[in-house]
Each structure stands twice: as C-alpha cells, then as structure tokens.
Design a protein with these regions (language model features):
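Substrate-binding cleft of extracellular glycoside hydrolase catalytic domains
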Residues: 1-25, 29-116, 122-124
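Short, charged, surface-exposed secondary-structure boundary motifs
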Residues: 37-39, 162-168, 257-258
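Anion (oxyanion) recognition and catalysis
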Residues: 50, 122, 178, 242, ...
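Active-site-proximal beta-strand/loop segments in catalytic clefts of secreted hydrolases
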Residues: 5-10, 29-33, 59-64, 94-99, ...
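Catalytic domains of cell-wall/extracellular-matrix polysaccharide-remodeling enzymes
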Residues: 89-171
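Acidic/polar low-complexity segments and flexible, solvent-exposed patches
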Residues: 216-298
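Functionally critical loop-and-helix segments that line ligand-binding/catalytic clefts
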Residues: 1-17, 144-218
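Hydrophobic anchor at the start of a short beta-strand
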Residues: 56, 127-129, 152, 245-246, ...
Length: 298
C-alpha cells in the first residue's frame, strides 16, 4: 500500500521539497482545465515531482457530452503530455464525476464517450484508467463491465470532511467495495500535507505506483534536453527566457562525469528515450539541444 496525493492549481504553489520529505509516494496532477488549457500549476508541479523523484500520473476531469468533445479532451491531454516529454505508458486518469453534465446522458451514451476518450489516449501510447466517486458506481452511470481491464480509482470520503493529516492512515474497513480490485482509493478531500496550503486530496494506491512514469538511470536523476550548458546562472536564464516553460538548473551532468554546470532545460523527463524524442520534436521546430542525464542540485 502506497500513499499519495492528487493536486491542481486549486492548491496554489506547492513546496515539493516538503511534500517529498513528508513521505508522499506518488502524485496525480490535473492536466488540462475545462478551457483546454494546461492547469496553471501543471508545469511547476511536474517539475517538482521530477526533481524529488515522486512518481507521477495525470487526470482529466471530463465535461464531454459528445464523442467529438471526448476525443478533443483526450487530444488536449496528449498534447500537454507530449509537450512536457512525458513517457508513453504514463497513466491518464479519466475523471467521470460531473453530475450536472454527465449523469443525464444515460448509461449507453456515457459508456461510449469514455470509450472514445480511451481509444484516443491508448492509441497515443498512454495508459488509461477511470476515476469515479463511489456514487457514480452505485448509481450505474455507465457500464463498468466495458472497462474491466482498466485500472479503477474510486473516491469515498468516510470521515465527514474532517481534516485528516497525511501521516494518518485511513481505515481500510471503509475502503469502497465495487466488486473488483481497486488501483486506488481517494479517501478524503480535506487532507493536510506539509508543503501544501489548505486542503488536498489524499489517496491510497494498492499497486506499486513507480510504474506510472519511469525514473532516471540513477537514484535522484532525470533526463533533460538542454539548450544551454554554461558556467553562469545568468547566461542560462538568458537562454531560457526565449522559451516558455524552459527551466534553469544547477546540475551534476552524470553522462559527462558528474561535472556541475548550469543548464537551460527545455524538457525535464524521466528516461533517455523521452529526452531523445523531445530532441527530435524540437529539432523539427528548429531548436537544437543536447540530451543529458542529470542530478538537479538547485
């Protein structure tokens, strides 16, 4: 059993060093908003997870009422993951819970919409899972049997919305029963975690979350696509300023003997394959970069 969190820009700016020190073992990040734009804190949250080697997946809260909308939502998620160099095989959780838009669609139609999103996500090489509140299962909003092979993450809050500290384990006797094995249980929306101001959703995972996205070749390391390997922080920042989302790191470059330099990274990723794919994609846009395996110092 592993303990983690799911977060969005509702939590504001998160101190991931404190989150990691608190023992958080995985994080599930909101990917795109209803507008189709990235969650305002997605880039910062992903960078924090990567820096502190917290396995990460993403979720999308769906509002789709037609198959075309479901497919478009799925493509928006894929575009974001690819822009951020997230590996094929990363888990995408399809969040099916909006009573106002989804329940009235009926069982058959909602089932078809979820299938439409699943097809797009899996065709892009990502894994697909379903998140629901227990009430969605109990009320039979869609045909769960059609998704028997998909991981299932279920919310059930048993503590009357009282504050729960992250280091307090939930009562396993209150785990939701859905007639099949659960990937995870979201057990409160009023959790408190060091490094996060206010409430956060707390989760239990019953399968090793390390496979949600791969890690670097050495404990504490990541791969990156660097557009500037320099000695001075100011030069790295100047290079990074030309590219939205480009991050500046002081890092030990493990693939060249651990030399410590400043890097302007246009893609922080878990694997060499991801970094090389980012290199190809940016090269097609006329942006050249060097792939490195690094340990971030600051």
């Amino acid at each position: 059993m592993w303990k983690g969190i799911d977060v969005s820009d509702n939590q504001g700016k998160i101190d991931w060093s404190q989150v990691a020190a608190a023992g958080v073992q995985f994080a599930i990040l909101r990917s795109v908003r209803r507008s189709g734009k990235a969650d305002y804190q997605f880039a910062a949250n992903l960078a924090g997870c990567r820096k502190y080697i917290i396995p990460v997946a993403v979720y999308k809260y769906t509002y789709a009422t037609t198959e075309a909308q479901a497919q478009e939502e799925a493509r928006q998620v894929i575009d974001l993951l690819q822009q951020r160099g997230m590996a094929a095989g990363t888990m995408v959780w399809w969040d099916v819970e909006d009573r106002n838009t989804l329940q009235a669609l009926g069982r058959a139609k909602l089932t078809a919409l979820i299938q439409a999103a699943r097809t797009v996500i899996e065709a892009a090489g990502y894994r697909f899972g379903i998140y629901v509140g227990l009430y969605v299962y109990n009320e039979g909003w869609f045909d769960f049997n059609q998704f028997a092979a998909a991981p299932l993450w279920v919310a059930r809050y048993y503590n009357n919305y009282n504050v729960m500290q992250f280091d307090t384990d939930p009562d396993q006797n209150k785990k939701p029963e859905v007639g099949r094995a659960l990937w995870g249980w979201q057990y409160t929306s009023t959790g408190r975690v060091p490094g996060i101001n206010g409430n956060a959703d707390l989760d239990i995972c019953y399968q090793d979350p390390a496979g949600m996205e791969e890690t670097g070749t050495e404990l504490g390391s990541i791969w990156c696509l660097s557009i500037a390997d320099v000695w001075a922080e100011s030069i790295a920042k100047a290079a990074a300023a030309a590219y939205p989302g480009c991050l500046v790191h002081k890092a030990a470059v493990l693939d060249v003997g651990g030399i410590e330099i400043w890097i302007a990274s246009i893609a922080d990723v878990w694997t060499q394959a991801q970094a090389e794919e980012a290199q190809r994609q940016f090269a097609a846009l006329g942006v050249t970069g060097v792939v490195h395996n690094i340990r971030v110092i600051e």
